[in-house]
């Protein structure tokens, strides 16, 4: 039971810090609402045209692909550090992991997810 005291303390401190930050933000936020506070701020100049702009979904697709392959690097680093200890089995597993990721990239490329339209 004493092993879980540290975990419980960590969770409680996390909740207190999160709730404390939200409470502090609520207590000190500016309360005056007027026309100028609700306008979109653009370099100190009045906005011209529509302030709500639609973004292409390709931005989301590229961001998602970046996150996927960025996470791949996170898994490659510990493998590279302990490469000698893992031996041939670790090498085969990592090649399988990279093959699955390359297969996913090939599929996305084949489906046209990486083409800018």
UniProtKB/Swiss-Prot annotation:
The chain crosses the membrane at residues 4-24, 64-84, 86-106. It is a multi-pass membrane protein. The keyword Cytoplasm does not apply. Its EC number is 7.1.1.-. It catalyses: a quinone + NADH + 5 H(+)(in) = a quinol + NAD(+) + 4 H(+)(out). It is found in: Cell membrane. This is NADH-quinone oxidoreductase subunit A. It comes from Desulforamulus reducens (strain ATCC BAA-1160 / DSM 100696 / MI-1) (Desulfotomaculum reducens). The gene is nuoA.
């Amino acid at each position: 039971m004493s092993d879980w005291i540290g975990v419980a303390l960590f969770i409680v401190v996390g909740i207190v810090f999160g709730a404390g930050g939200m409470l502090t933000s609520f207590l000190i936020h500016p309360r005056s609402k007027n026309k100028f506070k609700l306008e979109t701020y653009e370099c100190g100049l009045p906005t011209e045209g529509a302030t709500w702009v639609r973004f292409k979904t390709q931005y989301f697709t590229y961001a998602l692909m970046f996150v996927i392959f960025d996470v791949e690097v996170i898994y490659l680093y510990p493998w590279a550090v302990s490469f000698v200890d893992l031996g041939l089995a670790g090498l085969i597993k990592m090649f399988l992991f990279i093959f699955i990721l390359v297969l996913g990239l090939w599929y996305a490329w084949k489906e046209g997810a990486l083409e800018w339209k």
